[in-house]
């Protein structure tokens, strides 16, 4: 078996594409989180960009009964619609939002 096939098989063990398997793994994880609740304000952190995937993840966390903290990394490249999506989703889902705004000059120097 070639290296690519071995890598694929290994990845499929950890990240299966079968919805039944994924659903069971998700259920186990959510159950574990809910059962380990202490007196914390949040159950999990969901990174939000304003795109479909992160907004849907936030929605699913709430649907599963979790109390997520939405975290957004503002690097200065946000679109107006992404910002509006984040505002709408966090308001509608009643989720707290923490936005970290980078120092643009420092961030720019890291990209060189």
Where are these regions (language model features)?
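ATP-dependent adenylation/nucleotidyltransferase module used to activate substrates
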Residues: 1-112
């Amino acid at each position: 078996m070639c290296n690519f096939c071995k890598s694929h098989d290994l990845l499929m063990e950890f990240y299966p594409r079968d919805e039944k398997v994924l659903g069971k793994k998700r259920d186990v994880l959510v159950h574990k989180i809910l059962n380990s609740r202490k007196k914390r304000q949040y159950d999990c952190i969901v990174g939000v960009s304003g795109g479909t995937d992160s907004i849907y993840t936030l929605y699913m966390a709430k649907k599963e009964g979790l109390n997520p903290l939405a975290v957004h990394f503002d690097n200065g490249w946000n679109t107006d619609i992404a910002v509006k999506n984040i505002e709408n989703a966090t308001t509608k889902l009643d989720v707290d939002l923490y936005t970290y705004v980078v120092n643009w000059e420092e961030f720019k120097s890291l990209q060189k």
